[in-house]
């Protein structure tokens, strides 16, 4: 008989998350528990449970899942996980140990199951906040960071025991690192409270490392900051988190990017914005001005009568984001500056200009006419 699709067995989509897969399996495991299926239904429940267990074992392992997604049942060992017909209801104890172990302080980092020896744990992930400039974010850079790292203790050579002594096998778990607790039909596997999952007890701990077998030191890492990275993005450095337990893999280091405020530019996605001061003479008469960009200077033609707040767009002068195929734009916002500390002669010239403008009426001011109309309406 051909096997059913593993995703169909668990009732989840092919893009289901690990949590969704675990929840679906837990639901089926509870449904087909022997305490809930007696008599004629027991055999069918056993088969359903085995089927769900096999699907869960394949889809909860990232490597097996990838092989299954690519090649189907041919990509995985057809005998793995089912244990043949001789397993019977023994599979319930193991599976429920795995499921309920997660509920009783066994965490998502645990690897291995009942009867598999000492518990193996993946190390915790670490985070590191890194501050860079806008220019560095735009162009990318190679950087070095120093992070705390656990290295083997030179005094005890990683054993955790005082020189001249050795660790002893834990008598509570017999070196397994875990203990089984039975609750009715349930067999719950928990970390040994005496040795904390190591399977060993150290009567005389090393004084240099406190019995941990490792000491914390500073480690220098090379980090490549990709061009276009944005504030809040994270870079993963695999295997540079905390070390695992009992030979488990190390966690990862996540470097979170923080971009410093810039004196000139403000970033909005791939676009940049900046305020450009312009004299009121240039705004009135027009002219060419220089504006800064991240790649140098650029020229803008200011037309006659440019008003404060006018926006000029320089295409392609923004930032090319890490997921973008082309750079954003630079938006220059005009700020018309009013002169200060005028001489008496300059004041006289401005007054003459003012009188001349008054004689011309509202035609010299784009908003003057509408403003006059609004005033009349307000006071009428």
Swiss-Prot record:
Region spans: Disordered: 359-380
ZnF endpoints (CR-type): 140-218
CDD domains given in the database record: DnaJ, DnaJ_C, DnaJ_zf
Family per similarity comment: Belongs to the DnaJ family.
Annotated source species: Delftia acidovorans (strain DSM 14801 / SPH-1)
UniProt keyword terms in alphabetical order: Chaperone, Cytoplasm, DNA replication, Metal-binding, Repeat, Stress response, Zinc, Zinc-finger
J domain sequence ranges: 5-72
GO molecular function: ATP binding; heat shock protein binding; unfolded protein binding; zinc ion binding
SUPFAM superfamilies linked to this entry: Chaperone J-domain (SSF46565), DnaJ/Hsp40 cysteine-rich domain (SSF57938), HSP40/DnaJ peptide-binding domain (SSF49493)
GO CC terms of this entry: cytoplasm
NCBIfam families assigned: DnaJ_bact, PRK10767.1
Summary of subunit composition and partner proteins: Homodimer.
Name of the molecule in the record: Chaperone protein DnaJ
Subcellular location: Cytoplasm
The gene coding this protein: dnaJ
KW Metal-binding (keyword) present: yes
Domain comment (free text): The J domain is necessary and sufficient to stimulate DnaK ATPase activity. Zinc center 1 plays an important role in the autonomous, DnaK-independent chaperone activity of DnaJ. Zinc center 2 is essential for interaction with DnaK and for DnaJ activity.
